[in-house]
Structure formats: C-alpha cells, structure tokens
Amino acid sequence: MSTYLIGDIHGCLDELLALLAQVNFDPQQDTLWLTGDLVARGPASLDVLRYVRSLGPAVRMVLGNHDLHLLAVYAGISRNKPKDRITPLLDAPDADELINWLRRQPVLQVDDQLKLIMAHAGITPQWDIETAKMCAREVEAVLSSDSYPLFLDAMYGDMPNNWSPELTGLARLRFSTNALTRMRFCFPNGQLDMICKDTPENAPAPLKPWFDLPRLVDPEYSIIFGHWASLEGKGVPEGIYGLDTGCCWGGDLTLLRWEDKRYFTQRAFKAEAEINNNNGFAAGEEVQH
C-alpha cells in the first residue's frame, strides 16, 4: 500500500501508464495523487480523463489552470485553441459526463495523517491551512453548482492580487483560483505577481518564488505542487515538492513515492523539438486566467 504523487500529465497518457508500470501501481491498494493539469498540450487528454476517472477512490487530484480552462471552453466561455489539442475531448460522446466529473474535483487536498497538502500552483504565503481550506471549499462549491459558468466567466484576470479576509464574491473566488492554480512569484509582502513566468534566477527584484517567502502553513506539513515546469523540481526548500517536469514539452513525467521519498521518471516519448514544431507553441506558455 503506497502513496504515489505525480506531476502535471497534460494529456500524456502513454507516459503516465509507463510510469505507473515502473512502480506496479495497484488501484486496489495504492493511492495516486495528481497535481492537476490532466489535460491540454499532450496528445491524449480525452483518454487521460477517462483513465483517471476509472480509478475511482484510488485517485486524489486537484484541478489546474488548464483543467479550469477546459471547463470554460466546454461552457462556451473561452475559445478552443488548436495547440491545446482538446477537440477530441470536446467532441467525445461522454464529454458531458467527463466534464461534470471534472468540475466536481477539488482544488486543494489536505491529508492530516500524512501531513500532506497539495495544490496545483502551491499555497500563497498569506494563507494558513485553515484559510486555504476555506477558500478552496468556496471555489469547489461554486464549480460543482449550477452557477459554475458565471464563475468560469469571471475567473479570468489578475486582480485582486492581495489577500484580505474582506474580499467577497467573484473577486474573492478569482484571488483564490489564481493563488491555487496560477501563482508562481510573490512580492515580499506575499502579494501575487501574475506577470512573471521566468525561472527564479531570472526574475526581477523584488519578486520571489512563493515558496521562498515565510509561510503561515504549519511546517509539519509538506506542500506538493505542479504547474511550474521550468523549475524541473529543483531549488525548492525542504518540505516543498515541485513535481511538474515538463513531460508535454519533451521533458519527464515525475512520480514521488511518499513512503521512502524515492523519485521515478518517465521521459516523454516525443522529443521537445518535435512536439513544439507540431503544435506551434513555446515551452512554458500557459493559459491566462
């Protein structure tokens, strides 16, 4: 009985299955944590959703910004971009079923026994665990409700970028969504910067990665995140684990076995140059909310 944590899959089903085969994953006994962005950019978003859904309670996942963007495209709010390669999913006979399953997935996972927290982008240094749980529940409640298209239409935007308990309504939901699914850099006071997409060493002062600022989260808890492929899982403090290693860009899909902290990787089956030439986008490009 093992706990496996895997970074952003982005429609790379073959690599996911090969990686799970390396560790003899057994959905009857093991638990699979997924950092979000199951879809877009890779070749098999539809089959990834079908497979992950088929695993039932063996999976603990969170939604990423690309998953939310898919929901917005399906709702007719955002445009379907060819480079995302999600048309087969949108046209699938079980699309309604998959989309309704996806929008009921959480944006935050907390396991008090394992002392694990997982969010796609991380946890803003302005939140403690209880605030993160509260804000995540608010986003999840509206996503799973009949009014979810209203939220999806309002989630695009970078403001507000500073947490306050006084935030309300769609502004509060937008901040929470950005903090949980898009965040990379913060100002020294914890305010989000939603512009810089660079590596930490190339970021302009005074920006710092969210994980390098003093945080309110109980240090007994480890934080698992994806989203930031250019980190390649490196340069993070003890107790922080970045698992997105850019499989859809020609990099690796990375798995961390929690019990012994051992990493396993599966190289992308297509080289980065081939992927980029076929799809016409640059590594690191992301959906803008």
From Swiss-Prot:
InterPro entries (UniProt xref): ApaH, Calcineurin-like_PHP_ApaH, Metallo-depent_PP-like
Top-rank lineage group of the source organism: Bacteria
Keywords from the UniProt entry: Hydrolase
Broad class of enzyme this protein falls into: hydrolase
Signal peptide positions (record): none
GO MF annotation list: bis(5'-nucleosyl)-tetraphosphatase (symmetrical) activity
Enzyme Commission identifier(s): 3.6.1.41
Catalyzed reactions: P(1),P(4)-bis(5'-adenosyl) tetraphosphate + H2O = 2 ADP + 2 H(+)
Matching PANTHER family: CYTOCHROME C5, PTHR40942
Family label: Belongs to the Ap4A hydrolase family.
Function: Hydrolyzes diadenosine 5',5'''-P1,P4-tetraphosphate to yield ADP.
Protein name: Bis(5'-nucleosyl)-tetraphosphatase, symmetrical
Source organism of the structure: Yersinia pseudotuberculosis serotype IB (strain PB1/+)
